């Protein structure tokens, strides 16, 4: 999948940077299902759907967005913690107060670095996307994001929700396939996972493979969401996020904000 095309269930938390000379350097953090539309709303003012806090300080640049959240609830929790780090219980052990001479955008990025390393978000296959590379900042070597998260660049392309990405289910052959772990036939309404390694034909129930990854990583009973593991067939190293990566599509202008599609994490709930 093209990493710049964002299908079912895009949820992003973004950082705005004010370029109005009178307020230059001010920042704003928000949540969106459509970054391209949201920045137009912010720069259009309250009458165009923008936030009251950004209306009198426009124009703004959307410089960074974190996406890959499984649903709006988890993304909104992340947004709240990023907006209010000094009162977030997730960051109790971190230095959340703004340092002397620390610019607002530097402070926001430092708090982001801390958030990516704490639960529940530290196990999610998130993408940290620099929409405008001239604003890019390097992570402190002492506060790097988890290895399974990626730093990517460039704008996201809107796509109509009806243009679904081809999934593993869409590619199923006519003959019945068995789960490599439980050996049961994988039914058409069950989540199927394939090994992406060339030449490997491994197929498994999503839940069975998740349990296997957690057990092999000695994380069984601690978490319900694995981070990585090895293919039971070819033994290749796999990131869980690559196996279950959804087709994150940004709704086009005429689409509504609400997203009701199920996400792969639904299948991990006991």
From Swiss-Prot:
One record GO biological process: double-strand break repair via homologous recombination
Cellular compartments annotated: Nucleus
Domain GIY-YIG positions: 9-94
PROSITE patterns per record: GIY_YIG
Zinc finger motifs (SLX1-type), residue ranges: 179-234
GO cellular component: Slx1-Slx4 complex
GO molecular function, one term: zinc ion binding
Cleavable signal peptide: none
Major localization listed first in the record, in broad terms: nucleus
Cofactor requirements of the protein: a divalent metal cation
Matches recorded under InterPro entries: GIY-YIG_endonuc, GIY-YIG_endonuc_sf, Slx1, SLX1_C, SLX1_endonuclease, Znf_RING/FYVE/PHD
Enzyme type, top EC level: hydrolase
Keyword Metal-binding included in the entry's annotation: yes
The entry's keywords: DNA damage, DNA recombination, DNA repair, Endonuclease, Hydrolase, Metal-binding, Nuclease, Nucleus, Zinc, Zinc-finger
Entry similarity comment: Belongs to the SLX1 family.
PANTHER family named among the record's database cross-references: STRUCTURE-SPECIFIC ENDONUCLEASE SUBUNIT SLX1
Function: Catalytic subunit of a heterodimeric structure-specific endonuclease that resolves DNA secondary structures generated during DNA repair and recombination. Has endonuclease activity towards branched DNA substrates, introducing single-strand cuts in duplex DNA close to junctions with ss-DNA.
Quaternary assembly: Forms a heterodimer with a member of the SLX4 family.
Name the UniProt record assigns to this protein: Structure-specific endonuclease subunit SLX1 homolog
Organism: Nematostella vectensis
């Amino acid at each position: 999948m093209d990493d710049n095309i964002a299908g079912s269930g895009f949820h992003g938390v973004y950082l705005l940077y004010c370029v109005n000379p009178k307020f230059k350097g001010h920042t704003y953090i928000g949540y969106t299902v459509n970054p391209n539309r949201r920045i137009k709303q912010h720069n259009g003012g309250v009458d165009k759907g923008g936030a009251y806090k950004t209306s009198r300080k426009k124009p703004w640049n959307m410089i960074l967005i974190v996406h890959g959240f499984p649903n709006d609830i988890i993304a909104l929790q992340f947004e709240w913690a990023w907006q209010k780090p000094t009162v977030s219980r997730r960051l109790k052990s971190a230095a959340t107060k703004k340092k002397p001479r620390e610019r607002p955008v530097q402070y926001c990025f430092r708090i982001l670095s801390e958030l990516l390393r704490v639960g529940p978000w530290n196990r999610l296959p998130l993408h940290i996307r620099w929409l405008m590379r001239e604003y890019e900042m390097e992570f402190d070597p002492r506060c790097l994001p988890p290895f399974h998260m990626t730093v990517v660049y460039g704008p996201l392309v809107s796509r109509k929700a009806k243009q679904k990405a081809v999934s593993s289910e869409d590619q199923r052959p006519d003959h019945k396939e068995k789960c490599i772990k439980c050996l049961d036939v994988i039914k058409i309404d069950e989540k199927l996972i394939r090994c992406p390694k060339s030449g490997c034909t491994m197929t498994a129930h999503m839940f069975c493979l998740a349990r296997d990854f957690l057990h092999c990583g000695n994380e069984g009973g601690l978490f319900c969401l694995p981070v990585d593991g090895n293919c039971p067939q070819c033994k290749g190293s796999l990131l869980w996020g690559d196996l279950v990566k959804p087709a994150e599509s940004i709704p086009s202008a005429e689409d509504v904000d609400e997203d009701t599609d199920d996400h792969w994490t639904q299948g991990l709930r006991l």
